[in-house]
């Protein structure tokens, strides 16, 4: 496995530009475009130091979103509409039962996007492991949080990431599969990955796991990861090709 580069900051230092508490907005179920507009507005305000850092907590009605590296062969075969977005990555699905969090965070200088992504992953890994999936970790070369192959299932992604940083402020974020259906993934090449699977916490734990169970623990772990109280560790259990490397950006 290729050794990751060292972050710009010490592992125990905050990656945030501010020490003020993060404000959390619990939004319920929100149309994707409405949430995107809200993020853009908040990011502009945060860049001007008019508001504190935010984390938006929500779910979406069923929708496909296509990041900048989405390829024609990734697109859905079931006729559902696709929203082209300004985050990184390729195509994914959002819908009921999937916990979505969008941190609007002003990053400290010098901005280290890779470290920010690793801290998002670290928070997710901590939360998922605490909930009873101790094997959860990373696949080198691929973003997100993964569960190793077991019981006939391949290595499977349980949480996806896609971010954008503009004027030093983060947008978009993470999606954690709790008790959502996986059927909508059957009609796309999710994140451009054809040689792995997808899973939910409900499937891994053998019980229904609603999104509400994960909100407070994940918020706490994100806060700790951003602050450096939860430090990034090597949780990689496999390596695989990066499905976005060297692909052209859309538009």
Swiss-Prot record:
Protein purpose: Catalyzes the transfer of endogenously produced octanoic acid from octanoyl-acyl-carrier-protein onto the lipoyl domains of lipoate-dependent enzymes. Lipoyl-ACP can also act as a substrate although octanoyl-ACP is likely to be the physiological substrate.
Gene3D superfamilies: Bira Bifunctional Protein, Domain 2 (3.30.930.10)
Domain BPL/LPL catalytic: 49-230
Species this chain originates from: Corynebacterium efficiens (strain DSM 44549 / YS-314 / AJ 12310 / JCM 11189 / NBRC 100395)
One Pfam family here: LplA-B_cat
Further comment found in the protein's record: In the reaction, the free carboxyl group of octanoic acid is attached via an amide linkage to the epsilon-amino group of a specific lysine residue of lipoyl domains of lipoate-dependent enzymes.
Active site per UniProt: 191
Coiled-coil annotated residue ranges, if any: none
Subcellular localization(s) per the UniProt record: Cytoplasm
Record keywords: Acyltransferase, Cytoplasm, Transferase
Broad class of the protein's primary localization: cytoplasm
EC number, as in UniProt: 2.3.1.181
Keyword Cytoplasm set for record: yes
Family label: Belongs to the LipB family.
Listed pathway(s): Protein modification; protein lipoylation via endogenous pathway; protein N(6)-(lipoyl)lysine from octanoyl-[acyl-carrier-protein]: step 1/2
Gene encoding the protein: lipB
Name by which UniProt lists this protein: Octanoyltransferase
GO process terms (BP): protein modification process
PROSITE patterns: BPL_LPL_CATALYTIC, LIPB
Gene Ontology CC annotations of this record: cytoplasm
Keyword Cytoplasm included in the entry's annotation: yes
Reactions accelerated catalytically: octanoyl-[ACP] + L-lysyl-[protein] = N(6)-octanoyl-L-lysyl-[protein] + holo-[ACP] + H(+)
Site (Lowers pKa of active site Cys): residue numbering on this chain: 157
Residues annotated to bind substrate: 87-94, 160-162, 173-175
